Design a protein with these regions (language model features):
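PPIase-associated folding chaperone regions across multiple families
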Residues: 1-51, 55, 106-214
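Peptidyl-prolyl cis-trans isomerase
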Residues: 63-114, 156-157
Length: 214
C-alpha cells in the first residue's frame, strides 16, 4: 500500500525515476546513447516546387546560405525561418534521437523524420545541407543544426521539456529499468507483504507494467 501510494502520482513517479537515473547515470546511459540523443535547431523555408524554385524562393534560399556563412544559426533562424513553432525560439526544436524517425515513436518531436535522420549523421555544431520534405501541408526545405550531443548535459538541460523527453527516452531505451527503479524504492521503503499471494500479485503487476523479471 505504501509503495502504491508513493507511485500513484505521475509527478512523484517522475521524481523517483529522475533521482535514480541521476544517481546511476553512468550505469543506465549506454542503451540511450546508442540512440544518438541530441538537441537540434532548424530553419524551414516553404516552397511550391523544390525542383523548380521561383525567383523569390531562389533569392531567399541564397540569402539564408549567405547569412549562415557570417552569422550564428540561431540568428539566421530567427530572421528567416518559416517554422511557426521554432522561429521565435531562435530555431530551437528541442530533443530528438533515432527513435524520433519512427511513426510509432513515443517522441513528441515535431521535426520531420528526414530532418532527424540528417541530424543523427551530424556532430555537435554541424549544419546539414538543404533537406526537402513533402507532407500533406506542402513542400518545405530544411536546414538542421546540432546544438548538443552530450548525454549528461541533455539529461540535465535547463529546459524542462528537453530534460523530461530525455528522462522518458532513457526509460524507454531499457525495458527493465522502470522495474529496477521501482524495486530499488520498494527495498528502501522496506515494503513487507503479509502473504505470498499478495507478493505474487505485486510481482505480476510490476512485470506486466514495467517489464521487470523477478
Amino acid at each position: 500500500e505504501e509503495l502504491n501510494d508513493y507511485c500513484l502520482t505521475s509527478v512523484k513517479e517522475k521524481e523517483m525515476n529522475k533521482k535514480y537515473i541521476t544517481k546511476h547515470f553512468d550505469e543506465v546511459k549506454k542503451a540511450w546513447e546508442d540512440k544518438s540523443p541530441r538537441t537540434v535547431s532548424i530553419i524551414k523555408m516553404d516552397v511550391s516546387d523544390a525542383d523548380n524554385l521561383t525567383e523569390t524562393e531562389t533569392k531567399k534560399k541564397s540569402n539564408i546560405d549567405k547569412a549562415l556563412e557570417k552569422e550564428s544559426f540561431a540568428d539566421v533562424a530567427k530572421a528567416f525561418s518559416e517554422d511557426s513553432n521554432t522561429a521565435n525560439k531562435n530555431g530551437f526544436a528541442g530533443y530528438v534521437d533515432s527513435n524520433s524517425t519512427s511513426s510509432v515513436s513515443n517522441s513528441t518531436s515535431t521535426v520531420p523524420a528526414d530532418v532527424v535522420t540528417a541530424a543523427i549523421g551530424l556532430k555537435k555544431g554541424e549544419t546539414s545541407d538543404w533537406i526537402t520534405v513533402t507532407s500533406s501541408s506542402g513542400t518545405s526545405l530544411y536546414k538542421v543544426y546540432v546544438k548538443e550531443t552530450n548525454s549528461k548535459k541533455i539529461f540535465n538541460a535547463k529546459s524542462d521539456t528537453v530534460s523530461n523527453q530525455a528522462l522518458y527516452a532513457i526509460l524507454n531505451s531499457d525495458s527493465s529499468l522502470s522495474y529496477k527503479i521501482l524495486d530499488s524504492y520498494a527495498k528502501k521503503l522496506d515494503i513487507k507483504f503479509n502473504d505470498k499471494d499478495t507478493k505474487k500479485k505485486f510481482d505480476s503487476y510490476v512485470k506486466t507494467t514495467y517489464g521487470g523479471d523477478q
